[in-house]
Amino acid sequence: MAKKVIKVVKLQIPAGKANPAPPVGPALGQAGVNIMGFCKEFNARTADQAGLIIPVEISVFEDRSFTFITKTPPAAVLLKVAAGIQSGSGEPNRKKVATVKRDKVREIAETKMPDLNAASVEAAMLMVEGTARSMGIVIED
């Protein structure tokens, strides 16, 4: 018989930098999970993606064991890395902060495909372009 899931915790943690301090400690402590065990496993699994924020979905079972699934980094984080900026524009409709080439948008869309509900890469590109527009990033060919 399969173990029964009692709680699902969703967090966004910098890759390779999970530690028992907030937000990880309190979220997992309430569920009764071995926090250091999770931190070590997460850091080992995401060591190659340093500098990116990784969404993670942790399933906690009745016996306090857990499994977790790492997702692809948010499109906004990938766009900031591609554009070389710290943050998006406060006024995206008036003030543009960077430009990104369309082939870079395609690369980001292909990276995000497993987590998006898009039927094709072109549809995923439109989603990423929308995120870029809302951040004040101009897309050029």
From Swiss-Prot:
<dbReference type="GO" id="GO:0022625">
    <property type="term" value="C:cytosolic large ribosomal subunit"/>
</dbReference>
<dbReference type="InterPro" id="IPR006519">
    <property type="entry name" value="Ribosomal_uL11_bac-typ"/>
</dbReference>
<dbReference type="GO" id="GO:0006412">
    <property type="term" value="P:translation"/>
</dbReference>
<dbReference type="Pfam" id="PF00298">
    <property type="entry name" value="Ribosomal_L11"/>
</dbReference>
<dbReference type="Pfam" id="PF03946">
    <property type="entry name" value="Ribosomal_L11_N"/>
</dbReference>
<comment type="similarity">
    <text>Belongs to the universal ribosomal protein uL11 family.</text>
</comment>
<comment type="function">
    <text>Forms part of the ribosomal stalk which helps the ribosome interact with GTP-bound translation factors.</text>
</comment>
<dbReference type="GO" id="GO:0070180">
    <property type="term" value="F:large ribosomal subunit rRNA binding"/>
</dbReference>
<dbReference type="InterPro" id="IPR036796">
    <property type="entry name" value="Ribosomal_uL11_N_sf"/>
</dbReference>
<keyword id="KW-0694">RNA-binding</keyword>
<dbReference type="InterPro" id="IPR036769">
    <property type="entry name" value="Ribosomal_uL11_C_sf"/>
</dbReference>
<dbReference type="InterPro" id="IPR000911">
    <property type="entry name" value="Ribosomal_uL11"/>
</dbReference>
<dbReference type="GO" id="GO:0003735">
    <property type="term" value="F:structural constituent of ribosome"/>
</dbReference>
<comment type="subunit">
    <text>Part of the ribosomal stalk of the 50S ribosomal subunit. Interacts with L10 and the large rRNA to form the base of the stalk. L10 forms an elongated spine to which L12 dimers bind in a sequential fashion forming a multimeric L10(L12)X complex.</text>
</comment>
<dbReference type="InterPro" id="IPR020784">
    <property type="entry name" value="Ribosomal_uL11_N"/>
</dbReference>
<keyword id="KW-0687">Ribonucleoprotein</keyword>
<keyword id="KW-0689">Ribosomal protein</keyword>
<keyword id="KW-0488">Methylation</keyword>
<protein>
    <recommendedName>
        <fullName>Large ribosomal subunit protein uL11</fullName>
    </recommendedName>
</protein>
<dbReference type="InterPro" id="IPR020783">
    <property type="entry name" value="Ribosomal_uL11_C"/>
</dbReference>
<keyword id="KW-0699">rRNA-binding</keyword>
